Amino acid sequence: GLGMRGPGAVSRFTYIPGTQIVALCDYEKERAEKCQKYLKEASLPKAAVYSGDKGYEELCKRDDIDLVYIATDWLHHFPVAKCALENGKNVAIEVPSAMNLKECWELVDLSEKNRKHCMILENCCYDWFEMNTLNMAQHGVFGEVIRAQGAYIHNLAPFWKYYWKKGEDDKLGWRLDYNMRHRGDVYATHGLGPVAQALNIHRGDRMETLVAMDTKSVVGKDLVKENADSVCNSFRNGDHTTT
């Protein structure tokens, strides 16, 4: 995926000594080709380009790839990761790594079966503030941590029109369409990930139940009207969600 987020990942990889970027893939070939500029600027050789619905499958069959980095729309995270693991590749996935518990467990099983890493790229766990706070918690600065609160607020108003649209009939783009059709905390790990690390979740403790509660949707219908010029009678996701 080389739309909004993927190109930045390509650029960052060029700064890692010894890294070879051997292949680029996007549904739209033009987007993949545009990312060749980052390789050129770093004096790296051009990468092979794959595109279309199943381009990622051909990419994953290559025998010169160690890691597949996935930055597609959410619904393609799991199928691409599954394909990569089945082909013996390590996998790094932007959030969320899967769309339901069944997919989560399938990734765990595939990772263990094929002895390959499968990592969710929860960037909010690794900013300086979160890493510093985790270090303090691990060194007992806060004593025993018995309660924590995290949050993530992201105003997407400037970006709605830039999200990938599959064809001329797709007026909303994948992200607005998903929020229109689904309720809940669509990617809770930005706010929850750093808290989970401080609480040693899956390192001696675990969460058993999560409950997401949202407000009613006020701006959703207006977003559909603004971006697709059509009337929306049902926008499911609320304006604010608390888990």
Residue ranges of predicted features:
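A short helix-to-beta-strand connector/capping loop
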Residues: 41-49, 113-117
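Acidic-histidine catalytic/liganding microenvironments
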Residues: 13-16, 62, 127, 139
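N-terminal Rossmann-like dinucleotide-binding module
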Residues: 1-42, 195
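Non-transmembrane alpha-helical segments in soluble domains
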Residues: 10-11, 36, 57-60, 81-85, ...
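Beta-strand-loop-alpha-helix segment that lines the small-molecule cofactor/substrate pocket
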Residues: 67, 73-74, 78-126, 140
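Predominantly a Rossmann-like dinucleotide-binding segment in NAD(P)-dependent oxidoreductases
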Residues: 114-119, 124-242
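A structured beta-alpha segment of the ubiquitous adenosine-cofactor-binding alpha/beta core
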Residues: 46-70
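Short, Asp-centered acidic motifs that coordinate Mg2+ and/or phosphate
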Residues: 23, 67, 147
